[in-house]
Amino acid sequence: MGIFEEAKKYIVGGVNSPVRAFKSVGGEPPFIEKGEGAYIYDINGNKYLDYIQSWGPLIFGHCDKDIEKAICNAVSKGVSFGAPTTVEVELAKEVLDLFPHLDLIRFVNSGTEATMSAIRVARGVSGKDDIIKFEGCYHGHSDSLLVSAGSGAATFGTPSSPGVPADFTKHTLLAKYNDIESVKKCFENGNVGCVIIEPIAGNMSLVPAEKEFLTELRELCTKNGAILIFDEVMSGFRAGLRGSYDVYGIEADIVTFGKVIGGGMPVGAFAGKKVIMEQLSPEGPIYQAGTLSGNPVAMSAGLAMLKKLKSNPELYKDLESKAKKLMKGFEEISKENGIDIQTNVVGSMFGFFFNSKKPKNFDDVNESDTKRYAKFHSEMLKRGFYFAPSAYETGFICTVMNDTDIDATLNAYKEIAPSL
């Protein structure tokens, strides 16, 4: 019996997060034993160049010595206290120092907790129940955000998972990404308390918002008294040191973070303006809590990560250069082989679509050739290149990847392209 079959005997589906099961690309997932730099190694000794990097957090690659040292030092003092620690204060100061429009922060344990809590605060402060989210944007698996599109952009959301009561999602309105008119329709009922969006969508591969769209969205929220939430769990510290703020310069009322902010440990956070955040308990009436929130080991990893990023701001140009080289190579090889492909790069994030037109929203993304992606994934994995096991996920570059790694990836794609 293989390890995956054995895992299925004890763990639901053999995995603890569905995408890891390789259902959308076929085959069995490699079980990873260790990571080092830009590479991961499975239990059979196979080596893979890792373009997932734990879905984004590992911007310095696996087993970075500075982060490893910070974690070991923290563990030696105790793994959890359930009490305040100075490292929480240090990390909070480092984060808020980057964002002049954010005054206070609250640490949690995951991106899902961050977005769920941000929406609770926004509803509590605005006094309105309805929220607007966008098709194709994923904000974690909390009930009110697990919705799919109805018959139109302004319809009430319908649950996209059994176990989510319709009453939970009836206050979730769906709009189309990069389509401001669909947002205006959602505002017509007068009961919208907040809007949540990935300003750089990383859960329909990579689709950045158009600046004009985000600018108008900011104006609409201000005009209608709705709180604007930027979900930067993925793009935070990845699109740039200050995430989407470096790309667009647009100020959200609340920003959620995750992934990079924890240095690879389970951490989430949400930060906002004082007038909003001071409504959280224990200062205000809106309740939010967590036994392991602000865990000293996770905070130490995040602090080491952020200090290293802030001391090397030039690294983002290098990361983006590598990502652009990879995507340009994919475009050239695809063209040589008559393959339709579209690519996007923002900072150290990249995405590509087997599609004849550049996707602007989820409808466009759904026109991509997912069967071709599945074959691409399988063939590249055989050759030692670990891309996301889903056409709807973003890829990531880390600092320890070099031109030789990129060239090897392009050579492998050149080899398989004629058969795709």
Curated annotation (Swiss-Prot):
Keywords: Cytoplasm, Isomerase, Porphyrin biosynthesis, Pyridoxal phosphate
Top EC group: isomerase
GO terms for biological process, alphabetical: protoporphyrinogen IX biosynthetic process
Required co-factors: pyridoxal 5'-phosphate
Residues bearing PTM N6-(pyridoxal phosphate)lysine: K259
HAMAP family: HemL_aminotrans_3 (MF_00375)
PANTHER family xrefs: GLUTAMATE-1-SEMIALDEHYDE 2,1-AMINOMUTASE (PTHR43713), GLUTAMATE-1-SEMIALDEHYDE 2,1-AMINOMUTASE 1, CHLOROPLASTIC-RELATED (PTHR43713:SF3)
Family recorded in the similarity comment: Belongs to the class-III pyridoxal-phosphate-dependent aminotransferase family. HemL subfamily.
UniProt subunit comment: Homodimer.
Entry protein name: Glutamate-1-semialdehyde 2,1-aminomutase
Provenance organism: Nautilia profundicola (strain ATCC BAA-1463 / DSM 18972 / AmH)
Organismal lineage: Bacteria, Pseudomonadati, Campylobacterota, Epsilonproteobacteria, Nautiliales
